[in-house]
Amino acid sequence: MNAEKPPVAHNVDLEEIAKFEAVASRWWDTEGEFKPLHRINPLRLGYIAERAGGLFGKKVLDVGCGGGILSESMAREGANVTGLDMGAEPLAVARLHALESGVELNYVQQTVEEHAAQHAGAYDVVTCMEMLEHVPDPRSVVQACAQLVKPGGHVFFSTLNRNAKSWLMAVVGAEYVLRMVPKGTHDAKKFIRPSELLGWVDETPLEERHIIGLHYNPLTNRFKLAPGVDVNYMLHTQAKKPV
């Protein structure tokens, strides 16, 4: 697991990084602040693996990997995984957990734009989960992800829709009522409508393949993937192949 020095970063919100650095030591606590990520990880992993035609032997980049929950699970599926993040503390936690778990993967402290400049067309699969709403310029991230994937490769995004229901459920409900995540985790003004995300995708060689909602039922305390993208949603895109 190699470490690379972080570059001079531009598309970075230092306040957002600081929020996650402060709780990084508890990233792998399945009952702590990141419990929802642990709960939804099997759903995300299953969706990505199914839509990408399996992960075994594929070169995968996890953008905004944090403490490595998804990165490590994809590596366990046989993928050659690189996790990318700008948070030093989450990456330190990710590296330590991988070492203790005996999972081989690489973590890099670098912006996705910098990584794209060095590794264009290098990956079979690129994932960008719950990251777009935490950067100043999400459009730039989408463009970089498109540059990183091989022709015919797959890029997955997940984020939160911007509307009253999403604010009520993801901010008021999740942060203040149910206390599923720390207060201040989300800024509803930074949420992204599917039409906006698809507009950015249309500016790249990526094509939409599938979109699905991630739903939480507080009565059953269960998550599921189902139609309806009014709160959380996942988007599967694929890079065009040369004609």
Curated annotation (Swiss-Prot):
Q: Give the pathway.
A: Cofactor biosynthesis; ubiquinone biosynthesis
Specify the species: Cronobacter sakazakii (strain ATCC BAA-894) (Enterobacter sakazakii)
EC number(s) reported in the record: 2.1.1.222, 2.1.1.64
> Is the keyword Transferase in the record?
yes
Q: Any idea what job this protein has?
A: O-methyltransferase that catalyzes the 2 O-methylation steps in the ubiquinone biosynthetic pathway.
Which HAMAP family does the protein's record reference? UbiG (MF_00472)
Transmembrane portions of the chain: none
Q: What is this protein called?
A: Ubiquinone biosynthesis O-methyltransferase
In its UniProt record, which GO terms are filed under biological process? methylation
Q: Which InterPro entries match?
A: SAM-dependent_MTases_sf, UbiG_MeTrfase
GO MF term list:
2-polyprenyl-6-hydroxyphenol methylase activity; 3-demethylubiquinol 3-O-methyltransferase activity; polyprenyldihydroxybenzoate methyltransferase activity
Top-level taxon of the source organism: Bacteria
